[in-house]
Each structure stands twice: as structure tokens, then as C-alpha cells.
Amino acid sequence: MTVATAQSTSALRVHESKNVELVAYHSLGKRPNFKMAMQVVAGRWYLYTGHFWHNGWTIVDVTDPYRPEVVKQWEGPKVNTWTLQVQVAEGKLITALEKIGTWLDPGRAALWGFDPSQPTWEEGALIWDVKSPLEPRLLGHFKTGGFGTHRNFYDGGRYMHLAANMEGYRSNIYVIVDISDPANPREVSRWAVKGQRRDEPAEPQLASLHGPPYVEGDRAWLSYGRAGAVLLDISDVTRPRLVSQFSIGDFGSIMGCHTYLPLKERKMAILTTEAILEDNRDSANLVALMDMSDETKPRAMSILPTPIPSEQASYSSYAQRGGKFGPHNIHMPHHQSCLAKVGNLLHLTYFAGGLRLYDIRDPYQPREIGYFVPGDPQERLARPYLPTKLVPQYEDILIDSRGFIYVGDRNYGLTVLRYTGPDLGGG
């Protein structure tokens, strides 16, 4: 199957698919999309996204998801700055600014797009007014004094919750910022683990908050890298307090814990690591379903099975494709009514393994029930950056409340999909 739009410069080929259909594809002007967010204004559905290999952001009208339309693109900082991450809520857009090639992978910064001849970058988080959805207006800029921010959380209201590299720290910590006056954002509190401050001895494995610091009521769920999964009590936002911490030991890449998402109604959480090294050179990565019935004692109930290629595939293992193979992002609703809740069906991007869908009704026996894997990209959409082999690298995912699935890849544009399998309920 091949789908292209009038705006597309290349088509998307379907290599494997089960219980997932291809709805549309848009090249976004050869700008691979990464983190996505959404708002609905006056009956129109707007998707906001940052990009790999390009500084700045794009707004896509997906009111008709079968015909996505780019309605605005604007530039961000031009030198050595990632603008990958976005959040939208209550008419505000939060965009992260971060030095390309941070502490995690400094030896390969150039492969991520860092230009060593210009050793400067922009950092922090920008606050925009998007009540007029096609006319973003900059309201304020929170600066960290360090490398900037990565994956942040904002669901509306007074506070944004940042995974921030602050001045004096080796890696990302948790920072709560008051944006009631967006022109003058103000830090309220911060929380870090042992060894992150530069004036204290480093730990053997440096921890860093990947984020987002996912807030559910008065709890903040922190995917804290090699420090594991951290749960904080933020009933007093000026004094975050540790509730529990779950170690993943030596499992996973150098990244460690990548995502920690609560499923409040089920007293569960989803914990993931992220594949970092190509050609399966990480310690085994995992996605675990956690029992949170006693929040002071998190307990892993099961680990999702590793994807196996179908008979449609031309290889016996995704690790043979090259690039990265392993978990990356899951859909996170961020308490937005335009986004789908996470119920009994878990959606997960898996780099070379494409998109994987899991039935998690029985948390002790999760099973894969669907997938979508594209063919190899037909061209690189930037200089010869990562992956070193031109293969699919599904990165991020967002699902709207209508059931349409949006995914991004390092060398593809926006792909729109739809689940066609049985209704598992719980959403």
C-alpha cells in the first residue's frame, strides 16, 4: 500500500501491519516530526509538533485526518538547539529549548546535528499564547542557566513541570515553575537525587530526569533515568517529598527509566526504558506494568514481550534491520480532553520495530495484538545523521479522542494511523 498527499515529497510504504490501517501521510516539507501536542479551537483540530534536524515548529490542521494540512511553520533558535518538545493546554504552548547532544551522548553530538564551530545554544522553555491557534505569540522565556529542558509537563493552570538542566548540575532535575505571570516565570522548587550537583561526588551511574514529570493530582511521577522510577508528593509545591523509588538495576540503556505513567483508576503505572545504542548494544530494555496499590512499594507485575517480525517481514529479527531497536514513547494524554485516555490498549513506538499495540487487560499477561511497521525510508531528510543505516526509527506517538494515531520518525514526516482491532474497553 502507498499513500501520498499533494503536499508529500515521498510516499510511505507499509511493510507490516496488523489491526492498524494507514490513514494519511504528510512529509511536512521534509521536516521529521517528533514530540506532538494538540488543541481543538472552534471545531478545528490542531496538531503542534517540533522536529528532528530542523529548528522550529509546525502546526498541522488534522480536522480531517485523512487530509492533514500544514497551516503554519515558524523558526526557532538556529544554532545547536533542539526544539523537539512541545506541550499545549488552555491556550498556552510550552516549547523546550535544549543544547544538542547533552551529557548523555556528548561523543556523538555531531551526529545529532551539533556544530562544534559555533559552541553556543539557546536553553530553557518558551511560553506562547496560542488562543489564536495559527498566531503563536511569545509571552515569556524561562532560563535554566544550563543545557536547557527536555521533556516537560503542562496541563494548564499555574505551574509547568520541567526536566531541566539547571546551573550547577550535571544532568536534568525536577523543577516547578510558576507561569501565572508568563512574562516573568518564577521557579517555585526543585528536586534532585544524590550525585547530580557538581559540588558533590558523582555517582557511578549518573541519573538524569528524562521526563515528563507527569502530574496526577498531588503526585509527580518522574522517569529519573538511572535513578529509576520516582514518585513525589507535591501537595506542597514548594517542598516536593519522596514517596517511593523503584530501581531497574542494570536493565536498560544508559538512559535508564524513560517514562513513568500512572494509570490511576487501575492503581497501576507503566515504566519504560529507551533504546539508545544502535545494533542492539544496550543492556536489555524493557516496558513493565507496575502495581501501585501501595504507592510506597511499587512492584513490577510483568514485562511486555519483545516484538517479533511477522511473516510479512524480510528479516527474522528487528535487531537485524540496523538502527535502534527497543522501546521509546507511549501515548500520554496529559489530562487533555482532545486526547485519548490510556485504557486497556497500550500504544508504544519501538524504533526499527515501528508501532506496537498491547492488550494489558491482564497486567500479569500482556500480549501484543497489533503493529504497524513502514518500509525503509527512501531518502535521508538531513545530512548523514543518525541512524547510521537508513531504516525506520519510530519515535513519538499521540492519539486523539477520535482514535486517530499520529507518529513520527527521524526520516519520515507525519504518519496518521487508526486501530482496527477489537474494542478492549477501559479508555
Regions found by a protein language model. Name each.
Residues 1-427:
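Feature marking well-ordered beta-strand scaffolds used for ligand recognition
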